[in-house]
Regions:
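Aromatic- and glycine-enriched glycan-recognition loops and surfaces
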Residues: 13-17, 55-67, 197-202
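C-terminal anion-handling pockets and recognition modules
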Residues: 172-177
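Aromatic/hydrophobic pocket-lining residues that form the small-molecule binding cavity
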Residues: 19, 63, 93, 97, ...
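Boundary/entry segment of secreted carbohydrate-active catalytic domains
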Residues: 3-17
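His/Asp/Glu-enriched short active-site or ligand-binding loop at hydrolase and phosphoryl-transfer sites
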Residues: 111, 121-168, 220
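Metal-dependent polysaccharide deacetylase catalytic core of the NodB/CE4 family, i.e.
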Residues: 6-7, 27-126, 145-147, 151-153, ...
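C-terminal domain-boundary segment and adjacent tail
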Residues: 1, 28, 33, 105, ...
Length: 232
């Protein structure tokens, strides 16, 4: 058997459905994961439209307690901008990138070392702001989402793969590679972008657990995956 695959499970937007439906399943299988949070309480904005039904965490004391508990259990919390709008990001990347890091760190008392580009929109100005803000790694998205454990990586434009309904882990996992996979809505289109049902998410995690238990896969946070590749 060659090197096991590394798999980093990531979740964008801080949607409540992720915490209510995905986290209990992740806990059941003892999988760490990375959650990229938007640093405000407004509805999610996508392509210029508001989606008030896509309920985000609202940074209440209850939510902060929930997130701190997840951190203690090995989850990673990363940043995903302040306003989740490309015009604001292009106009003031320093505020969007640095502000989201400061918001998370001040409330959760933990380092936010990872950033996720909203809509996978990466420009040199935004990338520079991410580096200057002190992040250690960030991911965009070109839908390949895997790296050989020994190939060079642009740590400030790491690729990822959006997971869709009815996908099987066996269709994309490869030994000796680091896979960064992304989830948004867990449920229906009323819950978030590109949703998969709770049943499908559970089935995918059950399949991933079989790979993990066989020694073929190690599930790690995004920052831990980056750390391991830097050492390889």
């Amino acid at each position: 058997m060659g090197d096991p695959a590394l798999v980093s499970l990531t979740f964008d937007d801080g949607l409540r459905c992720q915490f209510e439906r995905a986290v209990p399943i992740l806990d059941r299988y003892d999988f760490p994961a990375t959650f990229f949070l938007v640093a405000n309480t407004d509805p999610i904005h996508t392509d210029g439209g508001q989606h008030p039904d896509w309920h985000k965490i609202n940074w209440s004391e209850h939510d902060i307690g929930l997130l701190k508990g997840m951190i203690r259990r090995g989850y990673e919390i990363g940043a995903h901008s302040v306003n989740h709008r490309i015009p604001e990001l292009d106009d003031n990347p320093k505020f969007e990138v640095e502000g989201s890091k400061q918001w998370i760190e001040s409330r959760l008392e933990t380092e936010a070392s990872s950033y996720c580009y909203l809509f996978y929109h990466v420009t040199q100005a935004i990338k520079h702001a991410v580096i200057e803000a002190g992040y250690k790694q960030s991911h965009g998205g070109h839908n390949a989402g895997f790296y050989s454990l020994h190939e060079p990586v642009d740590w400030f434009d790491v690729d990822c793969r959006q997971i869709t309904q009815d996908e099987k882990v066996s269709e994309w996992v490869q030994a000796g590679h680091w896979h960064i996979v992304v989830f948004h809505g867990i449920g229906t289109w009323d819950d978030g972008w590109e949703p998969i049902t709770t049943e499908q998410f559970n089935a995918q995690m059950a399949e991933l657990a079989v790979f993990r238990d066989s020694g073929a896969v190690k599930v790690v946070t995004f920052k831990e995956g980056a750390k391991r590749l830097r050492r390889s």
